[in-house]
Amino acid sequence: MSAHRLSLSRLASSAAADCQQALHARLARQAAQLSAVALPIKLQPTREKMAAAAAKAEALAAVPSTVAGALQEAERIAGDAVPLLRELREPVGSQTEHTIQALLEWSFSELIANRVLAQRHAELERDPSTESMMIEPDCPLHAVLEHAIEETRAFAREKFGEAPEVNLVAAGDSSSTLGLALPAYIIFPLHELLKNSMGSHARRVGADRLDELPPITVSYAVHDGWGGIEIEDHGGGWGAPAAADASARFLVTTNPEREPNYQYSRDFGSQFEGLGMGLPLARLHARYLGGELQLAGLPGMGARASLGFDATGDRTDALCEKEWAQRWVRA
């Protein structure tokens, strides 16, 4: 091995160790916070399960060879809580409901960061089975959107029997891709937003009458390192602005009798489908990208979702740890 390649190998090994240590530190802090936070009595069993998973994840993350196992345990921290919290069905606006929202938002925000660190560690360890955190250097946004639309239309065909048409429109100065760095996790909010729009069309008129509605429109632009995507559908929209806001709150919009859907074969879906998790998780991913997700629309007409994000790759978490801690304490 040449001296240059050996130097690069050592740099990668050092960076992998840094990622592993950062993941261990995050999981240690998470376990400590879950053990110390005061919650209503009815939430104590949920907290105890989450704290136990966090402690196990912390122990696994302390050893480089078991980082992948640590991530699996980190998934359980939030995953175990969802069905338990769902059963509480607290009235919207109550103190317990507010605490549940804060608990889920904090847990899944931590989980997104854990996933990114674990994935980066695997990349630096040269694990060939791990996809890159970056979609592709200088990849045009329209290529990412075309891929997301194709995948989501495949999902809609499998679930409903047919998929709505989608028009992809470039808006503004979107021709330059120089310096563009799109993280792979932008795909998640795109899929969730497109999936909701396609589902609203199918539920409004039926899969066999989708041609009676105008196509879904996806507009996009990139300018000065900032990306914007707007998805507009004709699926009926929300009855009021408050309903649009509520749709991005955990566990609020789901039917309590509806079971999770595990059937989509391309695997980009989530085990939380059917639990009222899609849009809240999409919003957290948008914040992790340094942006925001906004929902609006005309009652009886359609919905409009606007996703803004940093397209330079410089942002990791839109909220610093101090801000997250303040949110958690207020809960």
Residue positions per predicted region:
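Short adenine-binding "F-helix/F-box" segment of the Bergerat
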Residues: A240-S247, R258-E259
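Conserved catalytic submotifs in the C-terminal HATPase_c
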Residues: E165-T177
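Glycine-rich acidic phosphate-binding loop
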Residues: E232-G239, L251
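Conserved ATP-binding N-box helix of the HATPase_c
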Residues: T152, L182-P214, V222-H223, P280-Y288
